[in-house]
Amino acid sequence: MAYSYSEKKRIRKSFGKRPQVLNVPYLLTIQLDSYEKFIQRDSDGQQGLEAAFRSVFPIVSNNGSTELQYVSYELGEPVFDVRECQIRGTTYAAPLRVKLRLVTFDREAAAGTVKDIKEQNVYMGEIPLMTDNGTFVINGTERVIVSQLHRSPGVFFDSDKGKTHSSGKVLYNARIIPYRGSWLDFEFDPKDNLYARIDRRRKLPATIILRALGYTTEEILSMFFDKVNFEIQDNKLLMTLVPERLRGETAAFDIEANGKVYVERGRRITARHIRTLEKDEIKQIEVPVEYIVGKVAAKDYVDLSTGELVCPANMEISMEMLAKLSQAGYKEIEVLFTNDLDHGPYISETLRVDPTYDRLSALVEIYRMMRPGEPPTKEAAEALFDNMFFSADRYDLSAVGRMKFNRSLNLEEGVGSGILSNDDITGVMKKLIEIRNGRGEVDDIDHLGNRRIRSVGEMAENQFRIGLVRVERAVRERLSLGDLDGITPQDLINAKPISAAVKEFFGSSQLSQFMDQNNPLSEVTHKRRISALGPGGLTRERAGFEVRDVHTTHYGRLCPIETPEGPNIGLINSLSVYARTNNYGFLETPFRKVVNGQVTEDIEYLSAIEEGNYVIAQANSNLDENFRFTDTYVTCRGEHGESGLYKPEDIHYMDISTQQVVSVAAALIPFLEHDDANRALMGANMQRQAVPTLRADKPLVGTGMEKPIALDSGVAIVAKRGGIVQRVDASRIVVKVNEDETIPGEAGIDIYNLIKYTRSNQNTCINQIPCVNLGEPVARGEILADGPSTDLGELALGQNIRVAFMPWNGYNFEDSMLVSERVVQEDRFTTIHIQELSCVARDTKLGAEEITADIPNVGESALSKLDESGIVYVGAEVKGGDILVGKVTPKGETQLTPEEKLLRAIFGEKASDVKDSSLRVPNGTSGTVIDVQVFTRDGVEKDKRALEIEEMQLKEAKKDLTEELEILEAGLFTRVRNLLIEGGVSEAELDKVAREKWLEQTLDDEAKQNQLEQLAEQHEELRKEFERKLEIKRNKIIQGDDLAPGVLKVVKVYLAVRRQIQPGDKMAGRHGNKGVISKINPVEDMPYDENGQPVEIVLNPLGVPSRMNIGQILETHLGLAAKGIGDQINAMIKQQQSVAKLREYIQKAYDLGHGSQSVDLSTFTDEEVMRLAENLRKGLPLATPVFDGAHESEIKGLLELGDLPTSGQITLFDGRTGEKFERPVTVGYMYMLKLNHLVDDKMHARSTGSYSLVTQQPLGGKAQFGGQRFGEMEVWALEAYGAAYTLQEMLTVKSDDVNGRTKMYKNIVDGTHQMEPGMPESFNVLLKEIRALGIDMELDEE
């Protein structure tokens, strides 16, 4: 393949055997697309804001005389951009304005005559906007809305699997779940009666629902049963015969016809008997009269002469009844066909327990169940039932629900509306009875065809609709009050409920989460997370094993590896690499179509529902050059996800890629196929906790997923359009755009501003560094600047470290690690952490708090780092306890001592009416102040420091805009110059005149003259735009800040802390191999090889076999080979060997193995080869894709090429004695991460601190400055040693003996070291609790 200029800087050699059919899709699609659909005006109004408005409007007054109609909406421009919102602590949102029309009808005139129309734009609150990276800025912090996996609307058939009843009988049930509205359940009880529940309330016989729908007993029976006809002829009883119905029964009498006995009495009726009966076309047989006894009448029988009801429908027929019927003149009797095998009498039985007799009684019964205690009226009962399932306002199945419903009941897909029909309800009951009769299957609720994804847009729309409905109620009430003469839509609408609903969702919903911003991977993963928790989802406590387990339909949709350990395991999942949601919200994954054993280029996305019908081959099936399967039998997933062997011609689809199964984080683990799943899970989760190091270092052994993740995460800067780098410094990059990519009439300059040293949500440091040089060509979509944890546009979470697997004096016992001092000296794992501390000055009852350097009772030295406004200088190095912002709070009048009275009398001032409430550096933190921001409320005078900061910001803004103008003007004048030269003006003439005068030239060619005039206009426009932008910037900087009520000033101080690695820090590899640093060892004591090169980390080999993560060993070997090749290249450069030799050697490295990648260095210029070699000096980056990685032979080949032992083991010497270790040791390069569990954040000690109110025991935890818990096991330990006094001290004076501890303090101060233990407070608590039970318990103190 052809590489672009910047791709040629460093090419990662890939071992992937299969060419990439489909590029990795944009990883944040699920977030961006979903919200885009919400915000956009949809033409059909099926989703988003438009749909919400259309579903609520028009709002008609109760008397129908006025209505408020919705016309359209528009979103304004946000006031501040994303960056400004973060600094100011506001929400990045756009105002929503809706055009509404108030129509008044003339009530006297004919219906529909309009009397008056008022149209107006109404403000309806603010809608938060999504940033380009799929996040929201809410109150200044970046948040992510996690997608939810919930049960799809539709109908589900399920069983209790025999767990409910003691007999173990399986009870079946059906549940209709709408998108919004009441749930309707049908269920069998152990006696086989069918019951219904509405909204999971108490159950009613299901036939009540049918009666409420208006069906009579006769209609109900005819809907659910087949009939059998009996004829009475000359005292004989003849039965109409349907032979098929007799299958499996035992003949209770001889079955004979036309004198031939077909089945003798007591014999079982078989298929042969049925065939003979059918062949002889027997339509009727004679049966004994007793046979009809116990059968059930299918309809009402009325004595036609008297009109009296002889036998009601659903009545069992007895001999007397038979006599009555024949007396009444009935020659034919219809009964229900039932049997024990597959036609149960369930509905008939249920009708017998049903207390109702007609529609009204059924409606009343339902009303009583839904609204117990209210007196039912006919109207109320009807309205309640109608509103429940048949009103579009209250009930909506949604398109998805209707689709699932129709599929389940085998109806046509597109038919039906969002509400239920009579046929829908009877259809569900029929199917449930079929399942009870043994025909049909119950649904699997964990199947991904029955669970769908609800993304940001949909959830925001639901919240918005809730807000609108609240507004609707208020508007309807207001419209019904009458007196609408001078009223406008603006007066009717109160935007508060809407903005409150939206705000609540974005600010405090369970699915709106504080973005995990440790590193680019954690951001991407967080946005691709799928949670089963949240509103309308599951709860941790109720979720069983089945829901959490991996399901066959997860294949290619949800990752089977990446999920948290702990109570949320399996409830929070991650989207697989290629997965996406379809229009209905179901997850789908791509496959290549296979036709007659030939794999085509066509790619189709299948959802879990569709996938079940096809045979699908795996991505690593063997194909020949014509894309035909080479094996006679291919391993495939067949129907129902079961694996099996199939012939090539039976295959329908083939997987797209080997990494289709896993998520983004799991796809970053090289040799994943050699790791145990549990360890891979830890590896995937721990990569998200890696802290960005000071100098990012790309992994030598990667998987090829590093580039897409770094690009899509949005932390790096990507070129919007191709061009040439015109200027570059640490804070901005200017690109002159290629002619063919510019829009006619623009300057053709792109300016990219870099983010410098800002704080992330996790207090890590975000900083962007340019990685292009002046004059370099860049193409669209290429990387211009690296962000945190990226290296030349590749994700770089850790460092490549030389490791050895060997024990070393117990320092790597139980997963600890021995680290060389060199790692610390070279700052390999040094990280920068930025903390934000803020000081708020409020208006209190006693007066305003003041930020000042004049603090009572504080020495000069403590104020040395503050300026005259009382705010710390930027650049000051501070440690725990130092004052950052001086602040005093007025305190109430206290009783004055005589001395103070004297002072007041002399100096006549209030010397002590304020107390010190300054912002200090928390204990245990130290660092450098890198930034200070002051926010002042409108109308409060700004202090000197605030004015200085303002001035500086104005200068910066002006400088930025001036530079931007200069760059744009330069671009413009280049075009003017070229135009003039083409138009016949000589260069010498142009150079004599000032640039501005060029625009006044006149040219002979009219077209060129027009162009010149256009350019002059553009220049004028540029100037105006500059002035406009400057003015906007100025206003933004100068205007007062919008602070919380009662707040006058906020000062934010940013501290940067540089943390080197130290014992107690947690580190990990990518294979779940985590550990804690036990010791930093001097370089000279570390084991070294024959060349004197020491290893950097010593790991314990015993951590590998039992954990079964062999991937780390293979990574180590391959890392050694990569480094070996880098060393060879380095040596060649140092020896100044010819470019041809370098080219040949590098080409050899790229050609090694059987990968599908081809790199042809002969197309590179010498300069490009040299630059590539320069970038490969530290090692040749390799990619071993998941499930398609390097083979052992390839690793050995690379080791040979790097002139290293193919065993991957090296003889090492002990650094302290110089002796050789007794056997070769596995040495190589492993990619190690430093995790965000730093010992500095966990170390904590307490001397005196706060106590719990009730128990009077010290609080727990570092945040509360708590003590160490002395639990029951610790008590046992002291008891075991008989340390009675120590134990007494622990349980009394060191804990909750209030008097004892004060005395103890006094004794220590007095120098008498004695302890007087008293009564622990927790004993008193126990006393009180016993008294609370009503038992009077006294303590007799002797």
UniProtKB/Swiss-Prot annotation:
- InterPro entries, alphabetically? DNA-dir_RNA_pol_bsu_ext_1_sf, DNA-dir_RNA_pol_bsu_external_1, DNA-dir_RNA_pol_su2, DNA-dir_RNAP_su2_dom, DNA-dir_RNAP_su2_hyb_sf, RNA_pol_bsu_bac, RNA_pol_bsu_CS, RNA_pol_bsu_protrusion
- Note whether Nucleotidyltransferase occurs among the keywords: yes
What CDD domains is this protein classified in?
Answer: RNA_pol_B_RPB2
One GO CC annotation? DNA-directed RNA polymerase complex
Q: Sorted alphabetically, which SUPFAM superfamilies does this protein's record hold? A: beta and beta-prime subunits of DNA dependent RNA-polymerase (SSF64484)
Give the Enzyme Commission number.
2.7.7.6
Q: Name one GO molecular function term.
A: DNA binding
- In its UniProt record, which GO terms are filed under biological process? DNA-templated transcription
Q: Which UniProt keywords apply?
A: DNA-directed RNA polymerase, Nucleotidyltransferase, Transcription, Transferase
The protein's matches in PROSITE patterns, at most eight in alphabetical order, are given as:
RNA_POL_BETA
Kindly report, in one word, the top-level EC class recorded for this enzyme: transferase
What this protein catalyses is: RNA(n) + a ribonucleoside 5'-triphosphate = RNA(n+1) + diphosphate
Q: Which domain of life does the UniProt lineage start with? A: Bacteria
Keyword Transcription assigned to the entry: answer is yes
Question: What does the subunit comment say?
Answer: The RNAP catalytic core consists of 2 alpha, 1 beta, 1 beta' and 1 omega subunit. When a sigma factor is associated with the core the holoenzyme is formed, which can initiate transcription.
Q: Which family does it belong to?
A: Belongs to the RNA polymerase beta chain family.
- What is this protein's function per UniProt? DNA-dependent RNA polymerase catalyzes the transcription of DNA into RNA using the four ribonucleoside triphosphates as substrates.
Q: Which NCBIfam families match?
A: PRK00405.1, rpoB
Q: Know the name of this protein? A: DNA-directed RNA polymerase subunit beta
